[in-house]
């Protein structure tokens, strides 16, 4: 799978955080399609952390939260696809995700196969709770290899936080985009700092594997995100900088 331009779409985290469910995802898919943003290339709808049960099933498989996703992920994936969109999900390199749901450490192949069976098109793979003494390069290579053999094209988003000299090895993992920064907070100071930090990393950005400057915060005046927010001019500048620097727009 070759990715020729920075992926674009929408991720649930900055709006809903862990408070996500089937109806909210369907409503978001409806809104993306009705707005025409999909026609402009915003075609990925990605569910972030917090979607699963707290334990795997007896076969070691991830299980969607039964109360919040009563019809399962394949049904939800089919709904998103019916709107002309692509369906994305979240996991983590560790035993646990950042929000303490089951991660994919040592379950990479079974999880990749599960995601393929659910019709997943995009995997955000976070860096929280990384096992001590295990290098990120190995962890991302494991999932990259698992996705390469799962029988489905799944865009691999390595959310590696820009640590551990990721730029030097990320293209050996099969990732199509990689987090080249720490988390973006909802403030002018944070987005300005991140934009400036990316200048030296531009040689690593391009077709096949794009530098991800974190999810957009445009228009998020009233959210639970850290930071005091921005004014509209600052949000517009934020969007322009992400475009100029070739970041995915999610």
Positions of predicted regions on the chain:
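Aromatic-lined carbohydrate-binding/catalytic grooves of carbohydrate-active enzymes
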Residues: 28-132
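Active-site beta-loop-alpha junctions enriched in small/polar residues
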Residues: 13-15, 50, 92-96, 128-130, ...
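Non-catalytic accessory regions flanking glycosidase/transglycosidase catalytic cores in CAZymes
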Residues: 1-41
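Structural recognition of the beta-strand scaffold that forms the well-ordered cores
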Residues: 2, 7-12, 41-48, 86-91, ...
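Extracytoplasmic, non-cytosolic globular domains
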Residues: 122, 128-154, 161-162
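Second-shell loop/turn segments in exported
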Residues: 12-20, 64-66, 101, 130, ...
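Extracytoplasmic/secreted proteins, especially bacterial periplasmic and envelope-associated proteins
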Residues: 20-27, 31, 71-75, 110, ...
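Glycan-recognition surfaces
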Residues: 107-110, 149-250
């Amino acid at each position: 799978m070759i990715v020729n331009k920075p992926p674009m779409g929408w991720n649930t985290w900055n709006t809903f955080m862990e408070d996500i469910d089937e109806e909210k995802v369907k409503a978001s898919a409806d809104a993306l399609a009705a707005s025409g943003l999909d026609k402009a290339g915003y075609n990925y709808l990605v569910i972030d952390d917090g979607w699963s049960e707290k334990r795997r099933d007896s076969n070691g498989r991830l299980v969607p939260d039964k109360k919040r996703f009563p019809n399962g992920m394949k049904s939800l994936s089919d709904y998103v696809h019916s709107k002309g969109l692509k369906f994305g999900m979240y996991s983590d390199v560790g035993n646990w995700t950042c929000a303490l749901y089951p991660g994919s450490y040592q379950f990479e192949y079974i999880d990749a196969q599960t995601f393929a069976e659910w019709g997943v098109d995009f995997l955000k793979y976070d860096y929280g709770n990384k096992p001590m003494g295990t290098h990120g390069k190995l962890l991302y290579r494991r999932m990259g290899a698992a996705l390469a053999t799962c029988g489905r094209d799944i865009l691999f988003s390595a959310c590696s936080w820009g640590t551990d000299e990721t730029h030097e090895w990320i293209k050996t993992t099969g990732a199509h985009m990689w987090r080249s920064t720490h988390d973006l907070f909802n403030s002018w100071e944070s987005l300005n700092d991140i934009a400036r930090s990316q200048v030296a990393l531009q040689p690593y950005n391009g077709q096949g594997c794009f530098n991800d400057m974190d999810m957009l915060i445009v228009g998020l005046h009233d959210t639970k995100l850290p930071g005091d927010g921005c004014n509209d001019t600052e949000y517009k500048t934020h969007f322009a900088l992400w475009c100029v620097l070739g970041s995915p727009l999610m």
